[in-house]
């Protein structure tokens, strides 16, 4: 949205959208592919110096695996650094040759061998070497990867964040419906650790979801005794035992709450609590006020309490009672007898102090640390005999070693926050003070000195007990604070690390040999596992997807997609309703609208427009800071965790000119609730009304008037729009179209500003501004090659068209050329059609669409599809296949489109069944018929020993051959056609380089001319000393003689020398580049094993719109064309204009997508304004009048922020140019949730001199009579979707059959038949059509002999049929025999 002082770029001046937005956008829409591009850049760190690299990505993975030390410890392989080489082929060549676009990774490693004899580990020798570790795929600048010649996208994954989570079973486990609480520690890699309660309130633990053990076994394995465990988890009541009778309790009043005493509780004679009454909080306060420190209680009060420590007779050393045992009468007597003065008991009750760990200790069979570790060993490795070392090592490796366990930075941050610690950083392993204090190695001492008294496992168990006690809440796992994004870079790093770990194992074994045999690092490292892991991930991972390339929007959306599926994620079948649902925390992070319909609903989401990921991978969204009720322009990004504590106002909250909130109560969000708050309470405000939606949803105008289900369909169907022959900008847009087109990468944008020097259909040359030239070697020329008629992944056509003319002045970022579905740099997915909402003879029943023949004639929805057909010549056992024009038993006419090499000409128009590439295959020797013998005698060998296996045009396809590529294996002789293609390619490349050089050379000479004209000469060709250099003199001089000129002016001489060096350097560089390109073109191709030659033929198929094609608007209003009607029969307006499309009005009210009606009204107004401008231009109106009218359109209402278009910036020529572009309609922008109001639409209709109600009288095309009432008419942006009837229609007579059942295959791809199923059989039975049914079940299906005979009969003109035995009956017989039941068919 434009502010008053915005200056317009060259592209924007061509056509400005009238903006109805009322809220100034203070934040530009960020780069839409940033989530992909930034993530992979951080992974590669290719542009960072080796010493400056951070420990992430490739560098992090290499550092985590190296150094690799041999088993003996006498040799080590250390990592020094890495560098990425130059890719062998560029993106275009990779696409063409079916290769992967990547760069070689070379890692420098250092082999260190230590002296065995020396006691101090002295170094024996060091060898440093560069090792090749395979190809690393490179990302194209549009965020895609080219794998085996196809463009793929790695979709980001939304997975559960590492850390600790508390949950309960929602009462589903136990029949009583009791909530069983559990906690789970999830690391980034390593074993999962679960804690859970059982219905009897004992606490258990599981490791990696195996069988459960009492949690005390885990604590005992850490080295805690019973007393220490009880001391950690319980508060202790101390009782002093009187020598004769009675007990003194050290009183903590709070601990008595809820108890019922059997005696009066008194304070100096006054009774505080009577016997038999429950002690309440009020009583506790009284007790605290009275200051009583001890309470005399009878012995019975102590009975049944649990001891916190072992009670030992001091004189004899006898154990009187162990910790965690209950006190009874006998024990009290024994205590008195032994002279025990005091005992400690656990403070537990049934309300909020459960005796959970005490209960657990009672079912724990182990007594010592070793027993506990052995028990864990038995659970993890059942059946293996445990030894002391094995049990200790296994336990230590589970959670306490850096190699096997990694919580990750994110996990540690989440863990510490959840257990209530202040600091967020820490160690990636689980830490326990007791366990590490008892171990006496260097690593443990470091951890103890750093982390001190904390204990991760204890903190989790305490947290779980607190929640069970009713203090604390469980986590919501669907909250975005508990789900994080794993992007390309992180996934690639994990895969790379897995490959490196495989290498590490092999290297460890070889290192011991390196000590004795003097191996080099290259001999030690085998890079295959790394390369294989990376190839597998980019080629076949569930998240590596074939890019959706229907149109620019589908590309952008695919790259911004977030999937909950994939490795380490959910599965469709197991994902419940909660995971899929919209969550409060999605606001501003994930789109609440765009998600697929069907089994994946809610599991695949789209990133909201402004969302980004933070350093931990959590999604965050921007907000404007509000200070004391005033909105500032300061923007802060908050994640879902942080925004919980703030009050956030909506973007459309009313403010005055100073940003002060004007309403007395502001609608806000706070902790997931919607409420009204005074302005002083507000902390933040949304940055934009479209903050909650994704790019696709933000492209739907009047989205706020559509039902959510239909909006979802509208957002999804825009991605299926096929690029039309001529793109047409939407008359009613949302203002984000230009951003999407720019970021999608389909347009050509100027890298630097300058003047257009040359333009043709394939190339644009820009002479760069002097101010933007960098360095002395930069010639200041940018050359942009345009993509012409290339096939996309979805077989649509990618083509770029220049928008600029020679002499145009462009700035950096301006659009130089349009791509598919873009119009002057704006996304344009469909066409603006004149639409009427009315029934028409039943042709728009059930969402059908009635189309005017004019639309077909004008090619409004004609699309070009490019099909790639491949013919492969292989080496077979009987000999090699051959591509040639000499094919047996084929007529001359069938071969007339092939050249002598047997390959079709470019430009040939072909139809289904035509031969594209002639190919013959050797066939095995068989008995020759007499005729064949005769042919062989006449023509020699050839005629019979090969069969025709040519590539033909598939059924249902016709088109024009636009390109042929021939690939030949190295060492196989190239045919004539391959040489022709090669020569053409070399010529094209040579011309390209020559042109580039000429342009650069021209630019250098032009700059040199400006520096030397007017200077005095010392010496030179055809010029005397002392003369002045003039333009005519230079024009008559040979270019090479310029460098012989010498002047007095040192600066000019330097300029001449510099120009000469520049030209020589460029000449050398271009020669080198040309020879590289030439060798790439002429070298043999790397084909699959057994393939000798491959020919690819590209067909351009023109598809006009027809009955059966699917179309849709942007509001989920989809339909199928039912009829194409002559123009003269369509309803027409009073001025005779026939409508283009007739839609059913009943499709609107029940679907509740009213946005389409508003779009139609505003679109009509936009078109009407265009007509008014056209009339003014045709009448040659004064420029001032035109300026005034445009001002009235754009700058009428000052309440609209977007309405301040500064027309004074436009010169008269620019204004006229813009007016010409507006004659087709003045484009409008109605931003999402901030769109045009009813009054504004009415005003636009008035200004366009159209009825303000948006309805007009239509007349019947058949009779010319007016219809009974007025009709809603207007312009809607309508799309043709990639569900074309041509792709679906299919017919078969005979074709392939299934091997076992001998029934025809199914589906168009297999050239299958239509299944005559069970229900269809019932229908024929009901009609009594017995012979038809017999035919269906036998000769038309799987009666093999019958159908062959039938074929012969039809050829002979005999229409009889003999039904035999269906093959499926034989299959049934065989299957029953496999059950050992014999069935035989007897002839009766």
UniProtKB/Swiss-Prot annotation:
Q: Per the UniProt entry, what is one GO biological process?
A: DNA-templated transcription
Q: Which GO terms describe its cellular component?
A: DNA-directed RNA polymerase complex
Q: Report a single Gene Ontology molecular function.
A: ribonucleoside binding
Report which reactions are catalysed by this protein: RNA(n) + a ribonucleoside 5'-triphosphate = RNA(n+1) + diphosphate
- Name of the top EC class for this enzyme: transferase
Taxonomic superkingdom = Bacteria
Annotated disulfide bonds:
none
Quaternary structure, from the entry: The RNAP catalytic core consists of 2 alpha, 1 beta, 1 beta' and 1 omega subunit. When a sigma factor is associated with the core the holoenzyme is formed, which can initiate transcription.
Provide the family line. Belongs to the RNA polymerase beta chain family.
Q: What does this protein do?
A: DNA-dependent RNA polymerase catalyzes the transcription of DNA into RNA using the four ribonucleoside triphosphates as substrates.
According to UniProt, the name of this protein is DNA-directed RNA polymerase subunit beta
Q: Which organism does this sequence originate in?
A: Xylella fastidiosa (strain Temecula1 / ATCC 700964)
| Biological classification of the source | Bacteria, Pseudomonadati, Pseudomonadota, Gammaproteobacteria, Lysobacterales
- Gene name in the database record: rpoB
